[in-house]
Amino acid sequence: NHGPRTSQGFRAGPNNIFFGAMDAVRDRPGYSLYVETDCVPVRPDWLGQINRHLQGAEPAWVTGSIYRGPDALGPREKRHINGNAVYATHDPAFQHFVDTVWRPRLAELVVQHPELPFDCVIEALYELADGRLATDNPDWELMRHASHKFRYSALIPNLAGSECSLHDL
């Protein structure tokens, strides 16, 4: 959060790389695995395990890990699915969600929260969604219809800042 602040927030670089990657693979068949440069495989046959999981799983737009490290997290981070995840880039409905919700809502939210990364936007939308207002709250309506498309998985563990042993996985 201490880098240069632009109109796109402190994390403009990583956010733009993510959306650029989503654009680059949008017309390719299948799923896409997005892996940032600070991530490494930690078990044999990791890619095969991910592929086998996708073959048997109910279709999801995003499959990834909740934060499993020891550090305290704020409200927009506590349940977010880490960006190092599998994305249903072949699904036109997912691409529509990226184009009409994810990217534009990030652009809106970074004005007030310049530290917001792309992978915390969904959690931020949950924070804004007020189910007590039901259909009078567009964020609640949106998340009520899209929530089942976001899945937690232990296949790509988010252990940032952790002293966790690989045997714990």
Where are these regions (language model features)?
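Alpha-helical elements of Rossmann-like donor-binding domains used by nucleotide-donor carbohydrate transfer enzymes
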Residues: 16-20, 45-53
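Catalytic core and acceptor-binding pocket of nucleotide-sugar-dependent glycosyltransferases
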Residues: 41-45, 56-169
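Short beta-strand-to-loop acidic/aromatic patch adjacent to the donor-nucleotide binding site
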Residues: 28-40
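Non-transmembrane alpha-helical segments in soluble domains
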Residues: 22, 51, 122-126
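Short capping loops/turns at secondary-structure boundaries
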Residues: 11-14, 39-43
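Secondary-structure boundary elements
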Residues: 24-30, 52-60
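Active-site-proximal specificity loops/subdomain of glycosyltransferases
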Residues: 1-30
